[in-house]
Amino acid sequence: LECNKLVPIAHKTCPAGKNLCYQMYMVSKSTIPVKRGCIDVCPKSSLLVKYVCCNTDRCN
């Protein structure tokens, strides 16, 4: 699986076991992602951040 990084033109191949792409948003500003990459478990959320995930190449 390949996931986008925060810079739109950059992407990376995910290591074994991390087979989801994610975008992390601040809950207070939920329109602009602050981090992107590979993740193993989804969804994750807290009081400050939320994760939006998908499982196809460069879908984040």
Swiss-Prot record:
One Pfam family this sequence matches:
Toxin_cobra-type
Q: Where is this site: Important for cytolytic activity?
A: 24, 26
- Where's it mainly located? secreted
Xref: InterPro entries? Cytotoxin_Cobra, Snake_3FTx, Snake_toxin-like_sf, Snake_toxin_con_site, Toxin_cobra-type
What SUPFAM superfamilies would the database entry show? Snake toxin-like (SSF57302)
Q: Which GO terms describe its cellular component?
A: extracellular region; membrane; other organism cell membrane
Q: Which domain of life is it from?
A: Eukaryota
Detail the disulphide connectivity of this chain as listed in its UniProt entry.
3-21, 14-38, 42-53, 54-59
Tissue specificity here reads: Expressed by the venom gland.
- Keyword Transmembrane helix present in the record's keywords: the answer is no
Q: Which GO terms describe its molecular function?
A: toxin activity
Intracellular or extracellular location(s):
Secreted; Target cell membrane
UniProt record, GO biological process? killing of cells of another organism
Record keywords: Cardiotoxin, Cytolysis, Disulfide bond, Membrane, Secreted, Target cell membrane, Target membrane, Toxin
Family membership: Belongs to the three-finger toxin family. Short-chain subfamily. Type IA cytotoxin sub-subfamily.
Job description of the protein: Shows cytolytic activity on many different cells by forming pore in lipid membranes. In vivo, increases heart rate or kills the animal by cardiac arrest. In addition, it binds to heparin with high affinity, interacts with Kv channel-interacting protein 1 (KCNIP1) in a calcium-independent manner, and binds to integrin alpha-V/beta-3 (ITGAV/ITGB3) with moderate affinity.
Task: Summarize subunit and interaction data from the UniProt record for this chain.
Answer: Monomer in solution; Homodimer and oligomer in the presence of negatively charged lipids forming a pore with a size ranging between 20 and 30 Angstroms.
| Name of protein | Cytotoxin 1
| Species annotation | Naja melanoleuca
